[in-house]
Amino acid sequence: NTLEGFSRLRKLGIPLDESEIKEMQISAVAYLDKMIVNQKKKNPDKNLSYEDICYLYVRSSYRDIPLAGETLDLHKKMVEKLRYWVNLSTIEKAYAATALYRYGFVEDAKDILKSLRQYAVSQPAKGMYWPNNRSHYYYNNSAVQEQCALFNAFSEIEPVTSELDAMRQWLLSQKQTNDWGAVPSTLEAIYALLEGGTDWLAPDENKTSIVWGGQEMKNSPEEPFLGLTEYTLSGNEISAAA
């Protein structure tokens, strides 16, 4: 989560202390590389596990940190296995598509998105989502986290504004009726709302306006887009409706 969070902050253009952060990233990535090699030596399974796919997904954000030796050899074999994605779960397909796209397997990534579109549901009230989009390998994932993984894949590989907006609409519908769950789910949902699709926070000619007693109520300058805006009128300013 930490490495993925740093990569998202960089993508959003958030200023970071690059020297200190980069040192942390290099150490964390080196640890992941070492762990995956050790695991594969102990359990040389022919198939990729959910954790393997997550590793490739996160590692693909740090292609500027080189691989070498047995780590590089293993990595190449794992990426090649990732191209056989048909039996993966929905979230695994999302991670696989993103990783393959970053590693240059563009057509494979687009094929995965084509398959995912076939299973998507679009409704005016809910937007675009995938029913039962829960990993059968990793029960801790919430539907919100999986929706965000799908959103990120579509946003990076084939960004269609109408689809991205519909996927964000589903996220907002979950917030209206429940909540986004634990902290990771909430962070991922906020990132999705900020990262792709129509800029819903941009001021434009179609912004919402409130008119009260013939006077337009202005947004608070301190909170132009988010937060609570209060309007107070004294008794003599209020008259009975005609």
Each language-model region and where it sits:
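A conserved hydrophobic secondary-structure block that centers on an alpha-helix together
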Residues: N1-P15
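Long, domain-scale non-catalytic interaction/scaffolding regions in large secretory-pathway
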Residues: S19-K22, I26-I36, K40-K46, Y50-A242
